[in-house]
From Swiss-Prot:
WD repeats: 9-48, 72-111, 117-158, 215-262, 272-318, 323-360
Classification via InterPro entries: WD40/YVTN_repeat-like_dom_sf, WD40_repeat_dom_sf, WDR55_POC1
Keywords: Nucleus, Repeat, WD repeat
Compartment annotation: Nucleus, Nucleolus
Species annotation: Botryotinia fuckeliana (strain B05.10)
GO cellular component terms, A-Z: nucleolus
UniProt key word Repeat: yes
Record-given protein name: WD repeat-containing protein jip5
Feature: compositional bias, Acidic residues: 356-374
Organism placement in taxonomy: Eukaryota, Fungi, Dikarya, Ascomycota, Pezizomycotina
Bias-annotated ranges (Basic residues): 405-416
UniProt-annotated stretches for the region Disordered: 356-430
Family to which this protein belongs: Belongs to the WD repeat WDR55 family.
Length: 430
């Protein structure tokens, strides 16, 4: 179970977010063209500063600090992505510029104009992804999928991609890398899944577009690869989960890309259809224990964040609210294992809920054991042979001790109920 740790207000509408691979750092791209980088507090520090007397965590160790903020693009910033070591932050905007910046300072180190092979007009980007230290993928409104070789500085500076493919007839809405094969020598992905319009496609770094699915007759919006699923009948252990525009997740067997194999209803929506599933991320393995199987986190068009079990008994296992109106357009997990959801003009940080009740029960059981030892320890056989009057006296004493424990338990519960979800203090906000 997750609980909301804090809410981070933004100066304008969120279009995209990216999480640093090794540090608790969040970068956001806004409709105003700004890119802003925040440092989140360490999970341990935030937990230590919570107490029952206040709902505001305001100590210096638990603030969200602005590392830097800049107007990076004219128009909106549509997409962001870190490279594999987190040293470089790539951004692309409706000005059709792709920029690389030092992630620690925000200083631009290189920029290119995204080409449009069909017309002389600008071709705004939709997604970017650093597939490996050598390859950057960029998709555009014109359905193009550009591959930039980062080892060839002259190509990157001139804005000419090493390869361009057209896997779909509509703009590319999601991009998910497939894991490298056992025969891979580099350890990096060379194939990836894309969705665009009503189709799914697989593209290879060396061979281009390998396969394109049948028309699904429903809009495909988000996707993520999930491995380690339980094998069941004809279904394998590796699948791609695809979020649709009608509130349904479709499951696709790896290697069987012509059509979907299973469906999970996330939002029924009645006759009008369900809410769109705009963003999706696989849940880290260390957080899956409480949900009984492999799960994905989905950002929905109604402002909810839903955890969906895709292995075993499938279905929604938790429903959280990010916003009452605005859609959730981005979800991800930071290096501390916290869930970050973004939509509208806010970002929310969610942390796995600590089961305080279980801890209290363990403490009470330990108190019972100690109390019983006190009663039995002094008398031995002689205590058991006392007359009935002594037994009645011990019973009365035991009732008083039990009453004391119940009072202590009530006090603990009272204190627990005073704890609220904190709103962190923010530094460097404009």
């Amino acid at each position: 179970m997750f609980e909301n740790l804090c809410t981070l207000p933004l100066s304008s509408e969120l279009f995209t977010q990216a999480l640093h691979p090794t540090e608790p750092i969040l970068s956001v791209g806004l409709s105003s063209g700004h890119v802003q980088c925040f440092r989140l507090p360490a999970a341990e520090a935030a937990a230590e500063d919570e107490d029952g007397d206040t709902s505001v965590v305001s100590t210096g160790t638990s603030t969200i600090d602005t590392e830097w903020r800049t107007r990076r693009h004219k128009g909106s910033c549509r997409t962001l992505g870190y490279n594999h070591d987190g040293e470089v932050l790539y951004s692309a905007g409706t000005d059709s510029l792709l920029k690389a910046a030092a992630s620690s300072t925000g200083q631009v180190t290189s920029k290119i104009l995204i080409p449009n092979t069909n017309t002389d007009k600008l071709d705004p980007p939709t997604l970017l992804h650093a597939l490996s230290p050598q390859t950057l993928l960029l998709t555009t409104d014109s359905c193009a999928l550009h591959l930039y070789d980062l080892r060839d500085n002259s190509s990157f500076k001139s804005g000419k991609p090493a390869q361009t493919h057209y896997p779909h007839d509509d703009y590319i809405s999601s991009l998910s890398p497939l894991p490298p094969t056992e025969m891979s020598t580099s350890g990096f992905s060379k194939q990836w899944i894309t969705t665009g319009g009503t189709t799914l496609a697989v593209t290879d770094l060396r061979r281009g577009v390998l396969v394109k699915s049948e028309d699904q007759e429903e809009e495909l919006l988000s996707s993520v690869f999930v491995g380690g699923l339980p094998a069941r009948g004809k279904y394998g252990r590796e699948k791609v989960c695809v979020g649709n525009g009608n509130g349904v997740i479709t499951l696709w067997e790896k290697g069987v890309w012509d059509d979907q194999s299973e469906r999970i209803i996330v939002d029924g929506g009645g006759k009008a259809g369900g809410e769109s599933l705009d963003a999706m991320i696989a849940m880290p393995e260390e957080l899956e224990g409480g949900y009984g199987g492999k799960c994905v986190v989905v950002g929905c068009g109604d402002g909810s964040v839903r955890i969906v079990r895709v292995g075993g008994t499938k279905g929604v296992v938790e429903d959280m609210k990010h916003d009452d109106i605005e859609a959730v357009v981005a979800v991800g997990f930071d290096v501390e294992g916290r869930l970050i959801s973004g939509g509208g003009d806010t970002v929310k940080v969610w942390q796995e809920k600590v089961e305080e009740e279980e801890e209290e029960e363990e403490e009470e059981e330990q108190e019972d054991i100690e109390d019983n030892d006190d009663v039995m320890g002094g008398g031995g056989k002689h205590a058991l042979e006392r007359d009935s009057d002594d037994s009645d006296a011990r019973a009365d004493s035991s009732d008083e001790e039990d009453g004391g424990r119940k009072k202590r338990k009530k006090k603990k519960k009272g204190k627990k109920n005073q704890v609220g979800n904190g709103i962190l203090k923010f530094k460097g906000m404009e």
